Amino acid sequence: RYADALARECNNPWAAAYVHEIMQEDPDILSKAFEAKPADLTWYRCTTKKERPAYSSKLLELPQSKVFSQTGTALMNTDIGHHTNNAMLSFRSSPYGATSHALANQNAFNTFFGGKAIFYSSGHRTGFTDDHCMYAYRNTRAHNSILVNGMGQKIGTEGYGWIPRYYEGEEISYVVGDASNAVSYTHLR
């Protein structure tokens, strides 16, 4: 649903390709309710006059891996054009830290196969300052990252990471994250 709006608003051929290819499997996907939420963009689709761009690009044409060093995110896929056979890894080590709506999850990863989560962050946001949000959802322990002597990462702009090195190859790809600024070493002394 969001890809459809992105395709229309930004005239984005890749978002249009995603919508087209998903609709090949489920032609009614855009007319189904999405968790009964108003954010499913039904109203947008009913009122917009913007057309979705033509299906001119295929997802197979995208690179299997992409690292966005400026934001500290990386995505790696095995078969991006066929999501039912695709293994995907997402990685985050962000120079923006864990401020505002961000989480203390530097050097965290998530894995998916066939569009379904295999290793994924736990928890959900119930309120910005409730115990669950502070001790689980926003905390490092709720993500696929390491704790140092049982301690999580800093929450704030000072708790940042970055991606100093990565490689995108035909047979193997990797990403290295440096989260040393996200961890307080004072408790180790």
What is the predicted role of each segment?
Residues 29-189:
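Catalytic and substrate-binding regions of extracellular carbohydrate-active enzymes
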Residues 1-38:
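C-terminal, helix-dominated tail/subdomain
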